[in-house]
Structure formats: C-alpha cells, structure tokens
C-alpha cells in the first residue's frame, strides 16, 4: 500500500527554478507561430481524419478487407463462419432495401451497397416475409372475390404457404447458384472486369424481391387490371436492379452470350412474378364449383317431388 505522502499533490516551481536545476533541458515556446506540433489537440466538435473518412466512405476498402479477413478466419463448418453473414446493422439493411426500391441508372447495386460484405439476414427475412404475404393475401383475395355468394364456402388453403416457400426460396438460391456457376465458367474463358461471389448474387436476388412484399399485399384488390399494373411496376423496378448489376459481369463476353444471359435472367424473373400472380390470385376457386354443378340436380329433384 502506498504511503500517505506519495498520494499528496506536489507543487512544482516556476520555469526559472526548473531550468536552473537542469540547464541542458530543451525548451519550446508554445506561443511562437513558427513552431508546429505533430499531434495538436482538436477543438471540441471537430472531426478527425478517421471520422472524415467514415463520413465520406473513403475507408470502405479497409473495412471490407477487415471483414473479409474475419470471415476467412473461421472454418466453414463452424457456427462462427456463418454468423458473420448475419452480422449487419439496421442501417445497412435499410440502405440496401432502399437501393433495391430506388435503383440508380448506371450504378452497380453490389458495388454501391454491398461492397464485398454480403449478408444473408436481409435475403432470408425478405423471402420469409414474402412467402407469408403471398399466401395470406392469396387466401384473402379469394375470400373477398366470393364474399356474399350463398354457394361459396371458404376453406383456408394452408398448402399455399408451403408452395410459396418452395417457389420463393428455390428461386432465391438455385437461380443464383446456376448464375454463379455460369459466370465462373465464362470468366475462365473471358477475363471479365466485374466478378461476383455466390453470396453477393444471393444478396442481390434477395433484396430485389423486397418490392413484391407490398405488391403482394396490394394484390388483395379484386381488380385484375390493377394487379397486372402492380406486377408490371414491380417487375420494372426489381428487373432493372438485376439487369444493371449483372450486365457489367457479361458485357465483355461475346455479344450473343451477354444478351442471352440478361434475357434469361429477366425471363426467369418474369416467370416468377407472373406465376405467383396467376396461381395464388387468379386461380379458379374449386370450392365454389361443386355447388354450382349440383344446382341443376337439385332443381330436377325439386320438380319431380312437386
């Protein structure tokens, strides 16, 4: 334990006394304007170089390299390896959702928002929300269309949840897997300037599906024209994100191959959108048909009994 005298304050003498004790000491006049300090204190409220780089986004490369190194530090069979793909904050997720809803012409979604730091948190929950939005909206749509009809008996179609989940998750994972394999194969033949990892492609496809969540809710409106207008708008927004993202990856390839790749991407996207609309919302209600078919038999039986 320290002595009591060691814990007391000690008063130092003035500068003259100190210089007399050590005449060889180096002195600097802080009021001299010709003297510059290497580490000057910043005034309150000012930003340093690191804060400026963070606001301007100039230190993204260092951060992405650090994140990439963290992901490679753990083996792929460990939980910590996959945990890094869900390590995103709310701001990053909202920023990527905003980028998928408001695509910037001529801008690459991966380079602008993902920055070599793909996440699976957004795509997973976007697909899950879309599955329930389509299934619930499809049931409500059929109910509202036949509301008030005496021969209609509403039966909840829970199988639509499993069907929607199979379709959405298969599209969000299998199509990126096939596209990644194709781009990897073409990159071995033609040295492309832009290349994407599998998780970056999954991230792009996952966030591009967000526009269909409000679209599926609005599909409840029992007007076929409104539904097709909504699906056209959703296709235009999400399709432009996919086209502007993957065109730089194939434009250095053969012209026909590049165009065929983009056309295939868009056709699969159209097939998903139109297929969901046609199956979950425009499909005929089978529970309504038997009542209409048995009506003539009931009329004949009533005539015979009379």
Swiss-Prot record:
Residues with attached carbohydrate: 297
Location(s), subcellular: Golgi apparatus, cis-Golgi network membrane; Golgi apparatus, trans-Golgi network membrane; Late endosome membrane
Record keywords: Endosome, Glycoprotein, Golgi apparatus, Membrane, Transmembrane, Transmembrane helix
Secretion signal, residue range per the UniProt entry: none
Topological category with respect to the lipid bilayer: Multi-pass membrane protein
InterPro entries: Yip1_dom, Yip5/YIPF1/YIPF2
Compositional bias segments (type: Acidic residues): 50-59
Domain of life: Eukaryota
Keyword Cell membrane in annotation: no
Residue ranges of the TM segments: 120-140, 163-183, 201-221, 228-248, 257-277
One term of GO molecular function: small GTPase binding
Region (Disordered) residue spans: 33-59
Keyword check for Glycoprotein: yes
Segments on the Cytoplasmic face: 1-119, 184-200, 249-256
CC annotations in GO: Golgi apparatus; Golgi medial cisterna; Golgi trans cisterna; late endosome membrane; trans-Golgi network
One Pfam short name: Yip1
Ranges in the topological domain labelled Lumenal: 141-162, 222-227, 278-306
GO biological process: vesicle-mediated transport
Subunit structure: Interacts with YIPF6; this interaction may stabilize YIPF1. May also form a ternary complex with YIPF2 and YIPF6.
Family from the record: Belongs to the YIP1 family.
Name of this protein: Protein YIPF1
Protein's organism: Rattus norvegicus (Rat)
Lineage, uppermost ranks: Eukaryota, Metazoa, Chordata, Craniata, Vertebrata
